[in-house]
Design a protein with these regions (language model features):
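Alpha-solenoid helical repeat architecture
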Residues: 12-15, 49-52, 86-89, 123-127
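Amphipathic alpha-helical scaffolding segments comprising HEAT/armadillo-like alpha-solenoid repeats
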Residues: 1-11, 35-48, 72-84, 109-121, ...
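Alpha-solenoid HEAT/ARM repeat scaffold
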Residues: 21-24, 58-61, 95-98, 129-133
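Alpha-helix N-cap/helix-start positions at coil->helix boundaries
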Residues: 2, 17-18, 54-55, 89-92, ...
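Extended alpha-helical scaffolding segments
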Residues: 91, 98, 102-114, 122
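Alpha-helical adaptor scaffolds
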Residues: 46-73
Length: 145
């Protein structure tokens, strides 16, 4: 499996956004079930939080959610990256960004608590209804844990 993961990861360096998007997404799906298989590439995934293509940024969030499902403890120092994505100019990225806070709020609420005020503010001010709802969901997940 390691060879296949390496081949998938090689597409992360592609100049073609669709290939980067798919590679990041695949690494997240693999990492959900076997973090050790993607661990060598994990920190490198964070560069996609600022990718020029919104779909790649969205895939980065999805990949992070997948990995965080079973390996949440590794995300503590990286929360500022996700906080920045809450302000992304792309609606779809902003709609998904609160979901990593929800996933981690259930598993490691101490990672999310410092961001509850920000999530609350966005839940009251963002122009996008889904963003507001997802921010509230992240707050509720954190409070319930």
């Amino acid at each position: 499996m390691r060879g296949e993961v390496s081949a998938i990861a090689s597409f992360c360096d592609s100049p073609v956004p669709l290939l980067r998007e798919r590679a990041v997404n695949a690494l997240g799906r693999i990492g959900r079930g076997d973090f050790d298989a993607v661990e060598p590439y994990w920190t490198g995934l964070f560069r996609f939080a600022s990718d020029e293509d919104a779909k790649v940024r969205l895939s980065f969030i999805w990949a992070s959610e997948n990995i965080a499902t079973n390996t949440p403890g590794i995300f503590g120092a990286h929360m500022p990256v996700f906080a920045e994505l809450l302000h992304d100019p792309d609606d779809k990225v902003r709609m998904e960004a609160p979901e990593i806070f929800r996933v981690l709020g259930k598993r490691r609420p101490e990672f999310v608590r410092p961001y509850v005020d920000l999530l609350r503010e966005i839940s009251e001010t963002d122009d996008n209804r889904v963003v507001r709802i997802h921010c509230l969901g992240a707050i509720k997940a954190t409070a319930a844990s």
